[in-house]
Amino acid sequence: MAEETQGADAVPQISFKKRTNKAKANFRKKPDTPPPASDSDSDFTSSDDEEGRRIKRRRKNAAVTASSTTAGPRRNVVEDQPATETAAIPLTSSNDATKHSNWYDEELSEKNLLGTTRARPASNTQSAPDGTYKGAANYSSFIQKNPNAPTKQFGPIKAPTNVRTVTVMDFAPDVCKDWKQTGFCGFGDSCKFLHAREDYKQGWELDREWEIGTKGKQLSGRVVSKRSGDAKTAEDDEDDDDEELLESIPFACIICKSSYKSPIVTKCGHYFCESCALQRYRKNPSCAACGAGTGGVFNVAKKLNHLLDKKRERARKLREQAIAEGEEVSSDEEGDEES
């Protein structure tokens, strides 16, 4: 009995609070469902049951009716809403102001273009052949390729950026001695020396000579050449042909390397001095220019004598004209006139 009384005392006592009339008056009720905007447009009818709930039923004979008021389009009016604050976008740093472009592709990197400086790997020892022929496709290649070599072998190659090269082109050519002395070279166009007779000087030498020659003098202009409107005559055409022929003929004998003395012409069309040709024929009957056999036939070069006479006459007139105008005459022009 004592245990039953202790268990009854352990159960808590619950009290229920009753709602007062004032509290019931303040209790909000759910409003009734409003009727639809137009019952005629719908195929359903509504009615209230005994408990006050609205019941919707489908009409059996539904008719479509339209009016001018309901035919207009319905517009959804959006009320103005206050602007809401958007989330701040985090700023990212970029190098747009200092960005630069490089025309080299990623594949054409410095390693691919220049390679590396590591030593070549040791060659792999292949197994000895067993003597069986396996066809041309199975031939072994003994060429050792460097894997560190640049892959690009053609086209523009990127130069190293840590090396700066300066190239200076100095025009100091090696002149062919035979061509300068005689106007003939046995190598022809394949000669590696320059075929020229002019004496070239550096720019500073020309400027220095000009300053020395014109220092303290008053420079006065004069007519160097005058363009004539007259047409060329037959004599001018003949002179041009003679000049072209003289350019194709060496201006000196290639044996004695001096001016022609009683010039003769061989069957192959080369010109020599008469004494030089006869003296060479005693030892070697071939031509000194091309090596062809002469057969002991040497004809007098009448046309060359005529051309040389005209050349000397023209040089003499030019020299006299230069002296009359007070110009200096070089030693080369005097030598040409005497020859």
Curated annotation (Swiss-Prot):
CDD domains: RING-HC_RNF113A_B. Residues 16-28 have a biased composition (Basic residues). Belongs to the CWC24 family. It is found in: Nucleus. A zinc finger (C3H1-type) spans 170-198. It holds the Pfam family zf-CCCH. Residues 1-102, 114-133, 221-243, 319-339 are annotated as: Disordered. A zinc finger (RING-type) spans 253-291. GO terms for cellular component: U2-type spliceosomal complex. Disulfide bonds: none annotated. This is Pre-mRNA-splicing factor cwc24. Associated with the spliceosome. It comes from Aspergillus fumigatus (strain ATCC MYA-4609 / CBS 101355 / FGSC A1100 / Af293) (Neosartorya fumigata). Involved in pre-mRNA splicing. Keywords: DNA-binding, Metal-binding, mRNA processing, mRNA splicing, Nucleus, Spliceosome, Zinc, Zinc-finger. One of its GO terms (biological process) is snoRNA splicing. PROSITE patterns: ZF_C3H1 (PS50103), ZF_RING_1 (PS00518), ZF_RING_2 (PS50089). The lineage of its organism: Eukaryota, Fungi, Dikarya, Ascomycota, Pezizomycotina. One of its GO terms (molecular function) is DNA binding. Residues 40-50, 325-339 have a biased composition (Acidic residues). InterPro entries: CWC24-like, Znf_CCCH, Znf_CCCH_sf, Znf_RING, Znf_RING/FYVE/PHD, Znf_RING_CS.
